């Protein structure tokens, strides 16, 4: 009798412990599920006047698997009538710094600045950022490896602009853009390959090397195998593009500056001479085609080398024109 009572009590006690443990586990699992949901939701704060922050943008379409942190600043005032500036980072992918370059100027001149970060996970190497995924391998282009335009990294920019317009109820129908170093590479190719975009003014500062509108030189350095039509090129020449160079950006051994027999013989050994070559050759191409040429080479920035903050300060006047 005693043994039966003891066995019953032991079973009852185990049932209580089991129920308690299951209940505790349910709570833990529920908590983990809630945390996972919270972590997977895009943490986005509405774009309000007078704010500095970051949000995550997910493009639609062929690049919907990509994720872009967008660092931004808005001045105080009516956002609906403020111009929109995109600031494109270089190879360091430090988009926060490229936003910060513009904060004071944005406040003083009443425009919004957005600096998208093309992270190295979703946009690895120069193929996905500097060369915008135009080809599967930008250094070995062919008609067979040409990606469709909806897979080009360029295709994200107008989408992002439309998203910002929606979030701010903006009345703007176009945007301006500034890029430095790798960002200037991305931006001048954006003008070449997507002249139909909503971009109004592009300021390209201190690009390391260029896709030059030059026949007989293979892409990514020239037009050969570029799959860039004359009609696109003519439209690109009609856009407003500033070639913006620091007079001291002359170090041929600068970090990440591309060197090979093609680009060195074609464009020169440093960023300054390469920028000059890009502009002069582009101008000659437009003259050869007898078409409108709205590209402008600005005065070279005195006392400044490869410095994005100083170049941004000088670029302001061209953004405001």
Give residue spans per PLM region.
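Bacterial N-terminal signal peptides that target proteins for export
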Residues: 1-7
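Bacterial N-terminal signal peptides
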Residues: 8-16
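A domain-start/cap signature at the N-terminus of enzymes
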Residues: 19-84, 96-97, 108, 149-152, ...
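Serine-hydrolase catalytic machinery in alpha/beta-hydrolase-like enzymes
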Residues: 59, 66, 71, 80-174
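Alpha/beta-hydrolase
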Residues: 86-88, 205, 301
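Short beta-to-alpha linker loops that shape the active-site pocket of alpha/beta-hydrolase fold enzymes
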Residues: 117-121, 208, 304
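The feature captures the conserved acid-bearing segment of alpha/beta-hydrolase catalytic domains
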Residues: 200-284
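C-terminal catalytic histidine-bearing segment of alpha/beta-hydrolase fold enzymes
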Residues: 276-321
């Amino acid at each position: 009798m005693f043994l039966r009572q003891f066995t019953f009590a032991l079973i009852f006690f185990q049932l209580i412990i089991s129920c308690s443990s299951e209940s505790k586990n349910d709570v833990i699992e529920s908590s983990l599920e809630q945390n996972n949901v919270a972590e997977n939701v895009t943490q986005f704060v509405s774009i309000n006047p007078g704010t500095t922050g970051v949000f995550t943008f997910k493009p639609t379409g062929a690049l919907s698997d990509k994720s872009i942190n967008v660092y931004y600043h808005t001045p105080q005032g009516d956002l609906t009538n403020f111009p929109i500036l995109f600031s494109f980072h270089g190879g360091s992918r430090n988009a926060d710094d490229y936003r910060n370059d513009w904060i004071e100027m944005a406040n003083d001149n009443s425009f919004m600045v957005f600096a998208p970060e093309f992270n190295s996970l979703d946009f690895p190497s120069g193929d996905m950022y500097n060369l915008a995924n135009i080809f599967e391998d930008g250094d070995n282009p062919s008609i067979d490896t040409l990606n469709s335009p909806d897979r080009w990294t360029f295709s994200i920019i107008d989408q992002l602009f439309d998203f910002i317009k929606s979030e701010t109820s903006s009345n703007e129908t176009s945007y301006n853009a500034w890029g430095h170093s790798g960002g200037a590479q991305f931006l001048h190719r954006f003008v070449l390959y997507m002249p139909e975009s909503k971009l109004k003014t592009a300021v390209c500062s201190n690009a390391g090397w260029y896709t030059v509108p030059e026949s007989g030189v293979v892409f990514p350095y020239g037009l050969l195998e570029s799959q860039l039509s004359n009609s696109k090129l003519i439209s690109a020449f009609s856009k407003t593009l500033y070639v913006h160079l620091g007079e001291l950006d002359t170090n041929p051994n600068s970090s990440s500056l591309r060197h090979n027999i093609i680009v060195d013989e074609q464009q020169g050994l440093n960023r300054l001479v390469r920028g000059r070559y890009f502009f002069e050759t582009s101008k000659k191409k437009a003259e050869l085609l007898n078409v409108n040429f709205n590209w402008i080479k600005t005065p070279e920035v005195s006392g400044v080398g490869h410095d994005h903050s100083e170049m941004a300060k000088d670029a302001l006047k061209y953004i405001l024109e």
